[in-house]
Curated annotation (Swiss-Prot):
Gene3D superfamilies: 3.30.300.10. It comes from Shewanella halifaxensis (strain HAW-EB4). The lineage of its organism: Bacteria, Pseudomonadati, Pseudomonadota, Gammaproteobacteria, Alteromonadales. GO terms for biological process: one-carbon metabolic process; S-adenosylmethionine biosynthetic process. One of its GO terms (cellular component) is cytoplasm. L-methionine binds at E56, Q99, D240, K271. This is S-adenosylmethionine synthase. Its cofactor is Mg(2+); K(+). Residues 99-109 are annotated as: Flexible loop. Pathway: Amino-acid biosynthesis; S-adenosyl-L-methionine biosynthesis; S-adenosyl-L-methionine from L-methionine: step 1/1.
């Protein structure tokens, strides 16, 4: 059986869609800091010289949307019109309204534990054992490349870099599922007009790619595509408009797991699109960390206004050490997947979300859904 290839991509914090995600989550964090029970659905649109912030919010908090937006754009690095976008001169339009009372009555309960889901939907969580973070390697290293691009841009190691960038990594896998190596690397980065293509290629290769990608997976056959169009001066919101929630595969598993379709950024934890996807990652990671499977994908689904999940299913791709029915029983016993329960389980009603809005929501140990604190109880209950 031949080797097979799998590719994932990532984008930098300066990508237009990620600007939008970060603004939406910055607004969410500012509201949650004052009002942990707020209901927030914040959507952002960015284009040349303009940011529009909209959505539905019900809260006792007051936040300065304009200042939050300008600070977020400024921190990303868009601080001059030469870059195509300027945090201090762009127009900001605020069209936020209130959450529908029809939704509120389905979510709020006299007993908080019976809080209903904020919407119907299906969510997936995934983990595998091919990296230390129990994440797929293609998305992991794609994130690392654009994160490194941001670091060397901000510390001026490569002063000609600009905020917008994209990466893509293709891994080759052996028939047994182990990593054979890296087949191809793509990195496109916005840059100032004065840098030559040869200097850019050398700088990206030596300062970004080589320090990030393990040498053991690189070979003379690995293909590199660095700014393959030859020019990327026009970027950010001038090059493309940006929208919240348009990078859902970048945000999750790079395509290696299925996706329920719901985006994360700008949504408070009552929205199971976000909170249940985090809980599903928590479940899948603990199952793999406990040695109960080498790969695990879990699906949960909800009905609006109903607390209990309408379904839980698990797929281990033939790698389970115990029966999948037992795995589902273990999940039901040790993880509370009701909206209130998972918010409490992962301590989600707090301002932790802006940091998630670039470089992936999963595989980063600073987030509570990455904890592996259920490993021992799962192993004991499974009898292994």
């Amino acid at each position: 059986m031949a080797k097979h290839l799998f590719t994932s991509e990532s984008v930098s914090e300066g990508h237009p869609d990620k600007i939008a995600d970060q603004i939406s989550d910055a607004v969410l964090d500012a509201i949650l800091e004052q009002d942990p029970k707020a209901r927030v659905a914040c959507e952002t649109y960015v284009k040349t010289g303009m940011v529009m912030v909209g959505g539905e919010v019900t809260t006792s908090a007051w936040v300065d949307i304009e200042e939050i937006t300008r600070k977020t754009v400024r921190d990303i690095g868009y601080t001059h019109s030469d870059m195509g976008f300027d945090a201090d001169s762009c127009a900001i339009l605020n069209v936020i309204g209130k959450q529908s009372p029809d939704i509120n009555q389905g979510v709020d309960r006299a007993d908080p534990k019976e809080q209903g889901a904020g919407d119907q939907g299906l969510m997936f969580g995934y983990a595998n054992n091919e990296t230390d973070s129990l994440m797929p390697a293609p998305i992991t290293y794609s994130h690392m490349l654009v994160k490194r691009q941001s670091e060397v841009r901000k510390d001026k190691t490569l002063p000609w870099l600009r905020p917008d960038a994209k990466s893509q990594v293709t891994f080759a896998y052996n028939p047994d599922g182990s990593i054979a190596g890296i087949d191809a690397v793509v990195l496109s980065t916005q840059h100032c007009d004065s840098v030559s293509q040869s200097d850019l290629i050398e700088g990206v290769m030596e300062t970004i790619i080589k320090p990030v990608l393990p040498a053991k997976w690189l070979s003379k056959d690995t293909k590199y595509f660095i700014n393959p169009t030859g020019r990327f001066v026009i970027g950010g919101p001038v090059g493309d408009c940006g929208l919240t929630g348009r990078k859902i595969i970048v945000d999750t598993y790079g395509g290696m797991a299925r996706h329920g379709g719901g985006a994360f950024s700008g949504k408070d934890p009552s929205k199971v699109d976000r909170s249940a996807a985090y809980a599903a990652r928590y479940v899948a990671k603990n199952i793999v960390a406990a040695g109960l499977a080498d790969r695990c994908e879990i699906q949960v689904s909800y009905a609006i206004g109903v607390a209990e999940p309408t379904s839980i299913s698990i797929e281990t791709f033939g790698t389970a050490k115990v029966g999948e029915e037992l795995l589902i029983d273990l999940v039901r016993r040790h993880f509370d997947l009701r909206p209130y329960g998972l918010t409490e389980m992962l301590n989600l009603a707090r301002p932790i979300y802006q940091a998630t809005a670039a470089y992936g929501h999963f595989g980063r140990e600073e987030f509570p859904w990455e904890a592996t604190d259920k490993v021992e109880v799962l192993r004991a209950d499974a009898g292994i």
